[in-house]
């Protein structure tokens, strides 16, 4: 027996229920659109180079590593009854992609992966904070920065913590062994242990959980995946890792990630 608030789960995607449609319509009427405008302006603030719907591919891979064109539908229709209006607006904000200047000598590439990658221009070269998920997305981010800020050597890389979208693109930033030796790689205490725990010991469970968490199997449309809150999704390229040769915190990684 199904109660009136339940629907039978089938393979067929459904329209919004009357209750959901009414709730979303009421929410839409009460949105502070001035605040939405402020957030839109902040998302575009200090953009040096805008990259609309970036597409990043990998040689001999049928599907792209990264493709924000899938989210163009967010700008092609009004807010549907199936999606909470605030989520719809958040989905638009996270499509913003390109090179941004945070402040003097600090730059970010946004919208090339789930996380952002930060470049600090030091006296002798770049200090890179976090490296995205994939080698390919990190390579494109570095290329974009070098094209518009001048090419500089990578003097240091900082892994802020052990989640894969913050270190997986390291070989896109430091592609050869010579650079690896000449560049300092800072990681929190316990970093490698945390990476192994998450991606080896708990790999099967974490992979299954991530499919629910990120909505990987959902279509990108008004009845599927809209956004992940902090970004669109993780990239599907080459995940890489090198061991940090410097320690930047006395605290265990598990503490830093809480």
Where are these regions (language model features)?
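N-terminal pre-domain segments of enzymes
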Residues: 2-91, 95-96
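Internal hydrophobic scaffold segments of catalytic domains
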Residues: 5, 12, 19-23, 167-210
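Conserved beta-strand hairpin/beta-sheet module of binuclear metal-dependent hydrolase folds
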Residues: 91-152
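Metallo-beta-lactamase
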Residues: 101, 150, 192-258
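Flexible loop/turn segments at secondary-structure boundaries
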Residues: 115-116, 135-137, 164-166, 193-195
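Active-site metal-binding motif and surrounding structural segment of the metallo-beta-lactamase
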Residues: 124-125, 136-186
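Active-site metal-binding loops of divalent metal-dependent hydrolases
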Residues: 131-132, 162, 190
């Amino acid at each position: 027996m199904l109660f009136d608030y339940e629907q039978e789960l089938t393979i067929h995607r459904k329209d919004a229920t009357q209750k959901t449609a009414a709730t979303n319509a009421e929410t839409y009427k009460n949105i502070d659109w001035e605040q939405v405008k402020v957030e839109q302006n902040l998302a575009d603030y200090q953009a040096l180079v805008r990259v609309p719907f970036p597409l990043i591919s990998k040689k001999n891979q049928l599907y792209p590593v990264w493709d924000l064109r899938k989210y163009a539908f967010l700008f092609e229709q009004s807010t549907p009854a199936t999606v909470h209006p605030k989520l719809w607006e958040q989905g638009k904000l996270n499509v913003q992609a390109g090179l941004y200047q945070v402040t003097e000598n600090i730059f970010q590439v946004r919208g090339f992966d789930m996380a952002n990658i930060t470049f600090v221009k030091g006296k002798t070269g770049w200090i890179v904070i976090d490296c995205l998920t994939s080698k390919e997305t990190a390579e494109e981010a570095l290329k974009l920065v070098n094209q518009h800020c001048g090419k500089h050597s990578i003097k240091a890389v900082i892994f802020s913590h052990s989640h894969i979208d913050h270190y997986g693109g390291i070989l896109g930033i430091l592609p050869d062994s010579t650079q690896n030796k000449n560049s300092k790689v800072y990681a929190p205490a316990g970093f490698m242990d945390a990476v192994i725990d998450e991606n080896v010991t708990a790999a099967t469970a974490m992979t299954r959980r991530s499919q629910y968490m990120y909505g990987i199997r959902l279509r990108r449309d008004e009845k599927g995946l809209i956004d992940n809150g902090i970004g669109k999704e993780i990239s599907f390229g080459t995940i890489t890792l090198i061991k940090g040769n410097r320690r930047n915190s006395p605290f265990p990684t598990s503490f830093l990630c809480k």
